[in-house]
């Protein structure tokens, strides 16, 4: 503590040189315990470079601040109210000592005055735990720069300090400022309220203007950091020159203002956020009026959000919509009358225990200025006033607890700063229906309000239009705003218009808010919660049209009974089944006749039975595929059809052998007959077909699969094979080979006896099958949609009909209509005729 005390002692010389008598009872009220008050009754923004370190500026030479006097009156009112309250600090008189700090120009001298004892001396001690300064606590000052200056002194002595409007986040550092508390929400809450306001009205293209002091720079940086995490962009940021209203601007400063307003005119952004003390804005808004910059939305920081002097520039009503962020309004009963009460008309002050005081305790024009703005102040509600009011009450309640006043009497004793500070941290009471307590950072939970400037005679000049609650971090109670636009439409401030649903953003330039809107392609969608700059592909079972924000399920396509192609194929299959069944009955009844035996005898019944089974399998092609239906499609149906084709091929070969090869190769023919050559051949072909079927099923499986229709991606084709076309080629290969073999042997037997000459019928059946299969393969090579399944089934049924009617039909015709040709004698005569022709 010794180095710090030495520093205080050296500065204390300044205090003793500059002390002078007090002149006005506004600033002093004697009491058992004094509160120090620091208020800006006059303001000067520029540094006082002409003063040396022994000089303190005379605040009365600067511009009067009506708001500052209003806040000082709030402290006086609170102290008077507490002194008249028998339940709070009974028999204890609370006093005050208040000083005008000229905004930032006069802070060190008042704080030294408060720290000194009644003899204006600050003794150097090793331990200040038992030191009693002039005041027990300090209320103020109002801005962050001044608060930090004062807090650096007061924190050395743990003298409680409660600021009512400083919002800098640096003040939350309790290691650096252990004795500092505040009754105003921190800067990050003010910034968040602005951001939520902009998000609510979809303003993502803004301009930021800041003052050149710490307040402007810090808050501008906080806003920039917050916007870096969101979708709001800063078109540009400019620093306003520090110009006081009663000072002449330099040519450079004037040109700077002209340039800034010109830039505002040229920008497409129509929302302007301004972080600046009110005094620097007077000349700026005069330049805005001169250049007639209209149509903007001005968002005011708390430093000028409810400033009556700027509001008095009534021509601003034509410049756009003014919105401000400020502390909630809490009406204080009786304060409106007290604010304009002449202090000389009140009760005379008690004799001071000391005739010494400090300078800057006068404001001759404050009362008159307050009277001129009283209507505005009254209608606007008590906002920052309540922060001063609650700060005084917080100290009073802490002092009440420290003095043990809970039983109706107080024990008056010396109060050490650290003792009172400890009690202030613990206060928790209700004041005008609002809870007063401090969080670990020393902040009090007050919500913020968004106010709109209005200029109607009967209107609230600062009408509340929304509330911001820091704990929930959201706007509530949003009311209609009177926009200064055509038809009262909400102003638009966007670098780019919002993309429609299903459009991605293509960045243009360096700002994420500037972009082009590109439609998402079919099959993709835009998930805005994940990425607004890239369209995502739909899942494999879903699809989307162009410019969609979501995908829809693809329609599953398979043959259905209500479709016309399915009905046609079903009718053909029914016709084939009935005709084949009729042929089977006819052949059964005429089994012993030469016509049936020449057609193959028992082999015919095998073929007809397999044809019936094949017709019965046709319904498995209709409806959604299952494992069982896929098995029938891939195994049972191909096997039946292949055996039928093999029977025809073997039968053709057998007839040729009987009439042409038996005489030339008698030994081979004898083996063919002895070892049942036809059935062995058919068994071999059947086994070969079964092997190919098993290989195909092992390669592809039996579980139904889906594939996208290449002609209509909204459709997903359900099939039994992931590679339906290649599988069909593989299964058809052996059948095509057998058809070629059957056709070849039938052609070789074209000169055989008429009753055994089946070349025409086999040629018809095999040629039809070969042609239809080749056509199907050609169709499938060019088209891979759902029609492939329909064409495959149609061709299959037609091939079955070709065998049923083309091969067996003529024989039934002969049996039924030419029975005289179905006799052994007729067949023998035909064989004899063939033999005679050969000879």
Curated annotation (Swiss-Prot):
Membrane topology per the record? Multi-pass membrane protein
Q: Name one Pfam family in it.
A: NCD3G
Q: Per the UniProt annotation, where are the glycans attached?
A: 84, 127, 248, 292, 312, 368, 428, 487, 527
Major subcellular site: membrane
Q: Which of UniProt's keywords are assigned here? A: Cell membrane, G-protein coupled receptor, Glycoprotein, Membrane, Receptor, Sensory transduction, Signal, Taste, Transducer, Transmembrane, Transmembrane helix
Q: Which residues lie on this side of the membrane: Extracellular?
A: 20-566, 624-635, 703-727, 782-784
Which residues are connected by disulfide bridges in this protein? none
Q: What InterPro entries does its record include? A: ANF_lig-bd_rcpt, GPCR_3, GPCR_3_9-Cys_dom, GPCR_3_9-Cys_sf, GPCR_3_C, GPCR_3_Ca_sens_rcpt-rel, GPCR_3_CS, Peripla_BP_I
Q: Which GO terms describe its molecular function?
A: 1-pyrroline-5-carboxylate dehydrogenase activity; G protein-coupled receptor activity
Signal sequence region: 1-19
| Alphabetical list of CDD domains matching this protein | 7tmC_TAS1R2 (cd15288), PBP1_taste_receptor (cd06363)
Q: Which residues lie on this side of the membrane: Cytoplasmic?
A: 588-602, 657-681, 749-760, 806-839
Report the record's Gene Ontology biological process terms. Answer: sensory perception of taste
Q: What GO CC terms are in its UniProt record?
A: plasma membrane
Query: For this UniProt entry, which segments traverse the membrane?
Result: 567-587, 603-623, 636-656, 682-702, 728-748, 761-781, 785-805
Gene3D superfamilies, per the entry: 3.40.50.2300, GPCR, family 3, nine cysteines domain
Compartments reported by the entry = Cell membrane
Q: What does this protein do?
A: Putative taste receptor. TAS1R2/TAS1R3 recognizes diverse natural and synthetic sweeteners.
User: So what family is this one in?
Assistant: Belongs to the G-protein coupled receptor 3 family. TAS1R subfamily.
What does the record note on quaternary structure? Forms heterodimers with TAS1R3.
The protein, known as: Taste receptor type 1 member 2
């Amino acid at each position: 503590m010794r180095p710090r005390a030495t520093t205080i002692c050296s500065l204390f010389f300044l205090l003793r040189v500059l002390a002078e008598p007090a002149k006005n009872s506004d600033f002093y009220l004697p009491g058992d315990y004094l509160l120090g008050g620091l208020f800006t009754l006059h303001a000067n923004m520029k540094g006082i470079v002409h003063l040396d370190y022994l000089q303190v500026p005379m605040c009365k030479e600067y511009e009067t601040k009506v708001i500052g006097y209003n806040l000082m009156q709030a402290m006086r009112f609170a102290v008077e109210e507490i002194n008249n309250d028998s339940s709070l600090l009974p028999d204890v008189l609370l006093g005050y000592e208040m000083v005008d700090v000229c905004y930032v120009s006069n802070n060190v001298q008042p704080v030294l005055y408060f720290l000194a004892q009644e003899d204006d001396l600050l003794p150097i001690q090793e331990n200040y735990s038992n030191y009693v300064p002039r005041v027990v606590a300090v209320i103020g000052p109002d801005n962050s720069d001044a608060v930090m200056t004062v807090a650096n002194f007061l924190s050395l002595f743990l003298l409680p300090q409660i600021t009512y409007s400083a919002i800098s986040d640096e003040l939350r550092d309790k290691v650096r400022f252990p004795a500092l508390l505040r009754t105003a929400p921190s800067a990050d809450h003010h910034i968040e309220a602005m951001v939520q306001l902009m998000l609510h009205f979809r303003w993502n293209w803004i301009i930021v203007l800041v003052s050149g002091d710490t307040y402007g720079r810090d808050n501008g940086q906080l806003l920039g950091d917050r916007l870096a995490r969101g979708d709001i962009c800063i078109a540009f940021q400019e620093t306003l020159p520090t110009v006081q209203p009663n000072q002449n601007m330099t040519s450079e400063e004037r040109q700077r203002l002209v340039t800034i307003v010109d830039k505002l005119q040229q920008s497409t952004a129509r929302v302007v956020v301004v972080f600046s003390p009110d005094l620097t804005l007077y000349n700026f808004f005069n330049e805005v009026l001169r250049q007639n910059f209209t149509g903007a939305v001005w968002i005011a920081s708390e430093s000028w959000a409810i400033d009556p002097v700027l509001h008095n520039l009534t021509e601003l009503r034509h410049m756009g919509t003014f919105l401000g962020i400020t502390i909630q309004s809490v009406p204080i009963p009786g304060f409106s009358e007290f604010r304009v009460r002449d202090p000389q008309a009140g009760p005379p002050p008690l004799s001071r225990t000391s005739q010494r005081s400090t300078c800057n305790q006068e404001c001759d024009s404050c009362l008159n200025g307050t009277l001129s703005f009283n209507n505005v102040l009254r209608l606007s509600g008590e906002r920052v006033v309540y922060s001063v009011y609650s700060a005084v009450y917080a100290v009073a309640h802490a002092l009440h607890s420290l003095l043990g006043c809970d039983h109706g009497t107080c024990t008056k004793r010396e109060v050490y700063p650290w003792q009172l500070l400890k009690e202030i941290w613990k206060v928790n009471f209700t004041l005008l229906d609002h809870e007063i307590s401090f969080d670990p950072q020393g902040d009090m939970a007050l919500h913020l309000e968004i106010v709109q400037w209005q200029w109607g005679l009967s209107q609230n000049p600062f009408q509340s239009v929304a509330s911001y609650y820091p704990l929930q971090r959201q706007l509530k109670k949003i009311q209609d705003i009177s926009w200064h636009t055509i038809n009262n439409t909400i102003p638009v401030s966007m670098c780019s218009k919002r993309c429609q649903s299903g459009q991605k953003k293509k960045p243009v330039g360096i700002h994420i808010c500037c972009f082009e809107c590109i439609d998402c392609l079919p099959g993709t969608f835009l998930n805005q919660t994940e990425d607004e700059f890239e369209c995502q592909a739909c899942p494999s079972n879903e699809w989307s049209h162009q410019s969609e924000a979501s995908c829809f399920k693809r329609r599953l396509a398979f043959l259905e009974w209500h479709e016309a192609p399915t009905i046609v194929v079903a009718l053909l299959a029914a016709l084939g089944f009935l005709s084949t069944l009729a042929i089977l009955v006819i052949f059964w009844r005429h089994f012993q006749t030469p016509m049936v035996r020449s057609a193959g005898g028992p082999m015919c019944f095998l073929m007809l039975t397999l044809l019936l089974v094949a017709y019965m399998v046709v319904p498995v092609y209709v409806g959604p595929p299952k494992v069982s239906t896929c098995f029938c499609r891939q195994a049972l149906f191909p096997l039946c059809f292949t055996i039928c084709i093999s029977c025809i091929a073997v039968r053709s070969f057998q007839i040729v052998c009987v009439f042409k090869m038996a005489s030339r190769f008698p030994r081979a023919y004898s083996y063919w007959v002895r070892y049942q050559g036809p059935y062995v051949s058919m068994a071999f072909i059947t086994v070969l077909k079964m092997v190919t079927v098993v290989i195909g099923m092992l390669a592809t499986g039996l579980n139904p699969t889906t594939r996208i229709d290449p002609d209509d991606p909204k459709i997903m084709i359900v099939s039994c094979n992931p590679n339906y076309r290649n599988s069909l080629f593989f299964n058809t290969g052996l059948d095509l080979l057998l058809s070629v073999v059957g056709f070849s042997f039938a052609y070789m037997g074209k000169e055989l006896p008429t009753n055994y000459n089946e070349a025409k019928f086999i040629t018809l059946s095999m040629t039809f099958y070969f042609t239809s299969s080749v056509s199907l393969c050609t169709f499938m090579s060019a088209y891979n949609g759902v029609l492939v399944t329909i064409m495959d089934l149609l061709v299959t049924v037609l091939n079955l009909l070709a065998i049923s009617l083309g091969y067996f039909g003529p024989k039934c015709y002969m049996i039924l209509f030419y029975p005289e040709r179905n006799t052994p004698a007729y067949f023998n005569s035909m064989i004899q005729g063939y033999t005679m022709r050969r000879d």
